[in-house]
From Swiss-Prot:
It comes from Methanopyrus kandleri (strain AV19 / DSM 6324 / JCM 9639 / NBRC 100938). The keyword Oxidoreductase applies. It comes from the Archaea. The keyword Transport does not apply. One of its GO terms (molecular function) is N5,N10-methenyltetrahydromethanopterin hydrogenase activity. Belongs to the HMD family. It catalyses: 5,10-methenyl-5,6,7,8-tetrahydromethanopterin + H2 = 5,10-methylenetetrahydromethanopterin + H(+). This is 5,10-methenyltetrahydromethanopterin hydrogenase.
Amino acid sequence: MVEINKVAILGAGCWRTHAATGITTFKRACEVADETGIKEAALTHSSVTYAVELKHLAGVDEVVLSDPVFDADGFTVVDIEEDCDVDLDEFIKAHLEGNPEDVMPKLRDYVNDIADDVPKPPKGAIHFLSPEEMEDKLDIVVTTDDAEAVEDADMIISWLPKGGVQPDIFKKIIDDIPEGCIVANTCTIPTRQFKEMFEDMGRDDLQVTSYHPATVPEHKGQVFVAEGYADEEVVEAVYELGEKARGLAFKVPGYLLGPVCDMASAVTAIVYAGLLTFRDACTDILGAPVDFTQNMAVEALQMMAKFMEEEGLDKLEEALDPAALTNTADSMNFGPLADTEILPKALEVLEKYSKKAE
């Protein structure tokens, strides 16, 4: 049986990018505040929301959040009542009643105004609670020492920055990570690359999976757990932990984690819906064999990927007039492809892009 009694989270995040999108809210953080009775939980974001959930909803004995930014001069705490003129109780109420935009514009505007003056991590970050408040109000352990955080940990969640930073950080603490420890990536590094990173450091013993939110954690309660790298019982344990902590959990083949969870999920959703409706139109209505249908779909996907790679995403219309497909794909406009309106809408979009290219 896999037991997860101590979780170390590396990296605390910064809310500036969340404010910049103009769409994210604190819906999940406010739900956690409501469920736990800890009002300050509503003011958490990024991995801090994770920490509260794991401690108070999943019942993990010890949750440690580590980031050198906690000691940085640029660590900036925004007081939503004094700085943004938003009452905390009203903030929570608005989110729970489904009206987050009654309060969110003031937070976004304030953070966007100060963002240029606050250094980016690790020299600075924007939060709504101080490290002391995180410890006192949220009952989690806060540290700037990654080695201390991972000591005796059963699971490590990496909320570290994107790019080539993660290997350099993990190299410093690789010998401090317990044997057989579960290590989970989030949205800043692909699971495959995460696993290869540890293999390159001689740590084949580590159980690699993911704890990917597919959005910012304070906005929506969900987590995606990668299959295919860690032992099945480990994946199951992390999945069950995620269900308790985040409210909703999904198991996803590790190689699909990025396409399902990152920005290109918008592309994946369209492609997946197309595959499902194309399959049913061909097999159920035309009576085509599934292997024949699959081969046709595979060729379409592979050749479109090749087309984009060879021509460039910004030059697609120059290489192939989108209207070309409006005169071919319309012959498949029946059954599920038509009933769901996926193909008619696609043809409409292609026609618009064809006219834009003229």
